[in-house]
A protein has these predicted regions:
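Residues at alpha-helix boundaries and short interhelical turns
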Residues: 62, 170, 213-217
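ATP-dependent adenylation/nucleotidyltransferase module used to activate substrates
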Residues: 1-143
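Catalytic subdomain that performs nucleotidyl-dependent activation
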Residues: 76, 109-117, 131-202
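Peripheral terminal appendages
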Residues: 1-31, 35, 39-40, 152, ...
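Generic structural signal of hydrophobic/aromatic residues within well-ordered alpha-helices
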Residues: 90-98, 112, 180, 209, ...
Length: 242
């Protein structure tokens, strides 16, 4: 297990360095009420008093009220300012406009909300001189479980090297509210959605594999496939050069 006292100090120093080098006046991040947002919010607030978490409902059918409550509970405990921007009408308008141009797929529709949230965070960041903090962890990044140019877009990410297992350990060390530690991880993209059901592997299996542990051949095959088909999300943009 990591020394989370040391990890806390190093990551807070990292965030302060990012702000100092960029000349930013503050930080903004998406507060979904999940574990990653909770940890990022706590770290950012410790590094910068002017930290804002934004809750962005976007016609999500999953229990938004519970997620919003969990996000506020973390924010209240650690003194993080919370704002709400309802993107539901924006998404509905976008879908209506798209109907005239293409026949959408469930996956394409699911990725609209994360990209609208990214746009919202960068609008706030641009208007107020903030930097956008990313909330993706190492487990999600390895299998590409994030939306390209959506929740994967940010100016800095203080938890990108932590697996889901380590995120939970870190939150327990910080005495974060149990509500974000005990519920099943979910991107809340559709009714009943959970990360593990959608991926077909548990985070325990994924984290063990990333750490070099042994897992069943079928789970290894699934993880390898997810990593392979999502490689385009992790590499720089292909740019033409002579």
């Amino acid at each position: 297990m990591r020394d989370y006292k040391e990890e806390f100090e190093k990551r807070v120093a990292f965030i302060k360095s990012v702000l100092q080098k960029s000349g930013a006046k503050g930080i903004v991040f998406g507060n979904s009420g999940g574990k990653d947002c909770a940890l990022v919010g706590i770290l950012c607030k410790a590094a910068c008093e002017n930290t804002v978490g934004v809750q962005m409902p976007c016609s999500t059918k999953r229990n938004y009220d519970v997620d919003a409550k969990d996000g506020r509970e973390v924010a209240d405990k650690f003194g993080i300012e919370t704002r709400v921007v309802d993107l539901t009408p924006v998404k509905e308008a976008a879908l209506k406009a798209l109907e005239a141009a293409t026949e959408t797929t469930p996956a394409a529709v699911a990725n609209i909300a994360p990209r609208l949230r990214m746009t919202t965070l960068y609008a706030i960041a641009g208007a107020e001189g903030r930097r956008v903090a990313g909330t993706g962890n190492a487990s999600e990044i390895y299998v590409g479980y994030f939306t390209k140019w959506g929740d994967g877009a940010c100016d800095f990410n203080p938890i990108s090297d932590l697996t889901v297992t380590e995120v939970y350990e870190f939150l327990r060390y910080l005495d974060a509210p149990k509500c974000v530690i005990e519920k099943a991880p979910s991107a809340a993209l559709f009714e009943g959605q959970t990360d593990e059901n959608e991926m077909g592997v548990t985070y325990a299996e994924l984290d063990s594999y990333i750490a070099g542990g042994e897992i069943s051949p079928d789970k290894k095959e699934k993880i390898d496939r997810l990593h392979r088909i999502s490689e385009h999300k992790r590499v720089p943009i292909a740019r033409y050069a002579e």
